[in-house]
Structures are given as C-alpha cells and as structure tokens.
C-alpha cells in the first residue's frame, strides 16, 4: 500500500473521497466513500464533470496498482487463476454468503494463536499460509498490506488494538475482491476431513486448535503416535519446554463407551449423556497425576466399543470473542454449575475433584500456574549447564592470571640479573 500512487495522488484521492489519511488502504471504506461521492459528483446529479473524471481515474489506478502488488512478487504458487478488472466486483463476503463469518475464522480462540502450525482451511489460516509462501518462494523479506492480506500485515499497517482486531479484520477482508486474495475457495468450502483410521477408532481426540500446534510439532515419532493432518494430538509426547511456555493447548476427548463410574459423574454433573457418548474435558498438563483407568472405567461386561458412525465436519460454535461480528445471531451461553464436593469420597477422588475444579473453572489461573511450574522446571534443567559454563570461565581466568604472573616474575628475574652484570 505504501507504493500505490504517488504522495500527491494519494492526498488528492483521499480529498475527493473525504476520508482521513489513516484510512488509506482500507478498501471497504474507500469503496463505500467512492460510491457516495460518485452520486454527488455525477453530472446528471448536478456535480462537476471534471471532478468526476478525476475521481474515476484515480480510483481505477488505485485498484490496478493494488492488484499488481501481488503480481509483481512473481506469483504465490497457489495456482489460483487471476481475473481481469471486470471480475473484481465479487467481494469475499458475497462469495461465501451468510456463512462468511464462520468460514472466515473456524475456531477464533485458537486460529489466532496458531501462527506457524495449522492445517485449518478457514480464510484467516489460509492467508497466513500465503504469508509464509510469499516469503519462501518469492524471496520477499518484508511484506506490507497489499502484497499480503494476512492478519499480521493488517495489524502492522493499521496498528489495530488487539481487543477489536478480529471484528475489524473480518470486515476488511469481507469487502476485498476475492480475486485479490488468491484463495482456493473450494478448500474453504470443503475443509480437509480426518483420516479413516481416526474415524474408526474407539476414542477420537478433537483439539481446540485447528491444526498442528507448536507442542504437537515437537512430538517425537519414536516416542508416540504422530499427529494427523487434521490436528489430532498424539497419545504420548515428548514435550519441549519452549513450546509449552508459548503455546499451551486444551483438548476434548470423545469416548464412545458406556458412561464412567460415579466419580466422573460427580465431577461433571452438568454433562448430558446422549446414548452412549460423553464429552470429557482434559488438560494436557496438570499438577496432579492422571486418573487411573480402574477408577474411571471399571471392568464390566457391558463395556463394548461401538462402531463410530460417519460424521460430518462441523464448524466450532462462535465464542464470546467472535460474537460481535455475527449479524443478529444469538448463541446461548452454557455456564456449568459449580462443583459441590460430596461425602464419601476417598482422598484420591477429592484430589481429582480439586484439580478439575481449578482447571475448568479458572483456566487463566491454571494456565499461569502451569507456566510458572514449567518455567521453574526449565530453570532447574539448565542450572547444571550454567554452572559448568561459569566453572569453565573461572578456570580460564585463573589460568590467564597464573600465566601473567609467571611472565612478570620471569621479567623481574631477568632485570635483576642484568643489574648484577
């Protein structure tokens, strides 16, 4: 956007559109202002023919230059066919219709976090993939808005506050011509389905992330199952401490078996049992050990795994962060009732109850405590290495001082002998 039109032409176009300078590059607002000024400056409406011609010329040049910003980089490698100027009237919101906001960001709370590792097919994640594609294949070290339309480039250009960035960014992309984004519309309409092996498994893990998180990317192949393409976590992991500090995740396990024992029902009294299915919230890291299988799932002749039916990919319900941009759609908020301890629980069951209560009803406190505990573990792990480095520097300094003292002593002896002669 900084190389579109000269400075004088920019100021003249904004003057004709009657927009402030900070809105330069906001295509939606500029296009709306252009339509309003076209009605006022049209000769048939009593406007000036010269001003109308100048406005049309500057506006056409602006759109052509923005279109050429991406083309001048040498292509994106997405093999999306570009249209001519006649096909720029179709905006992104018109392309996806009423479900634009759901397809724009499939899982708002996690798509914003997964910057590098994501296999999601929403518009937000696909534009982020284009950013990496442009840097790798086009050797573009610094990208600005216009060359790339990802969230980071948008925030860097407009300096948008974090609280409202998703709402403003969704409206910004909504009015953008779909042809300028180089998006594969088919992949947005038809996201990648999970593999058949995972569909036939008795227990299927669904993550709140839409793809590979930093923690899943560090999973060792020899230390557990490899994460699937749809973002399914491995059963056992060797976690790297920097990844845990930067990207804690939460998972949801769908267990297709008979309901657990009374302990789990006391912990989660608000969960509705439908047929033989129950949703159990889990946390990847906990201060206490995991619940033993014999406590949650006692041996029973009725515990027979049922075949998993074919499921349709559904989009995640919008959270509070994303409700503001939904046009007139009200989503009921499900507030789980507080956990009430019951008499007759063993110390182990009470320990599990307190852990789940802290993890699920105070996630911010739980995340901060887990991060502090992990940070302390990292410091202890690297303390020996720091001690060895300090010892090496100390030995080197002592050796240097001993050599310097020996040289000084040798010079003193030579000077003393020379005086005797």
Curated annotation (Swiss-Prot):
Residues 215-235 have a biased composition (Polar residues). It is found in: Host membrane. Tyrosine-phosphorylated on three residues 250, 315 and 322, providing docking sites for host Shc1, p85, and Plcg1, respectively. The modification Phosphoserine is found at residue 257. Keywords: Early protein, Host membrane, Host-virus interaction, Membrane, Oncogene, Phosphoprotein, Transmembrane, Transmembrane helix. Residues 215-237 are annotated as: Disordered. Residues 12-75 form the J domain. The keyword Ribosomal protein does not apply. The modification Phosphotyrosine is found at residues 250, 315, 322. Residues 1-394 are cytoplasmic. It is a single-pass membrane protein. The keyword tRNA-binding does not apply. GO terms for cellular component: host cell membrane; membrane. The chain crosses the membrane at residues 395-415. Residues 416-421 are extracellular. It holds the Pfam family Papo_T_antigen. Plays a role in transformation by modulating the activities of cellular proteins involved in control of cell proliferation and by acting as a functional homolog of an activated tyrosine kinase-associated growth-factor receptor. Recruits upon association with host Ppp2/PP2A the Src tyrosine kinase components Src, Yes and Fyn, thereby activating their kinase activity. Activation of Shc1, Pclg1 and p85 mediate signal transduction pathways leading to cell cycle progression and cell division. MT also plays a role in regulation of early and late gene expression and in viral DNA replication. The NPTY motif is required for interaction with host Shc1 protein. Interacts with host Ppp2/PP2A A and C subunits; this interaction alters Ppp2/PP2A substrate specificity and localization. Interacts with host Src, Yes1, and Fyn. Interacts with host Shc1, Plcg1 and p85; these interactions lead to cell cycle progression. Interacts with host 14-3-3 proteins. This is Middle T antigen. It comes from Murine polyomavirus (strain A2) (MPyV).
